[in-house]
Amino acid sequence: MIDNRDTESSKNNHGISWNTRRNHAAWKLYLRDVEEDIPVYAVPALQTDYSGLPPAYTFVGDREVFNCETLKYIENLKAAGVPAQVDVYPTGLHAFDMLMPFRKISKEAIKKFEEAYVYAVEHYHT
């Protein structure tokens, strides 16, 4: 959850594990009654300056509720000069790697995530 505003992939999404209805409910619970001056720590997509943030790796399914906001977040990091990478998996819904770990795309996503973690520990951890 990066953006509390609807994106193209989050509106009218009927995914089985996470969807528009669940997303709206989660944001409502999380933000409570805060509607103005929402801290960027609560909603990272509201950030305007991404410089100085740590490198990032993530993956997302192309049918994922968070697809658009994830891609935009990585794009913003890169534009600020932050090393960032995202892998997009076809047919992937929210949490596909955990719900269907036996699928080829899940195994690939898990493997690449583990590789990115090891790389981060070796190159960025002090």
Q: Language-model features: where?
A:
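Alpha/beta-hydrolase superfamily serine-hydrolase fold, recognizing
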Residues: 1-126
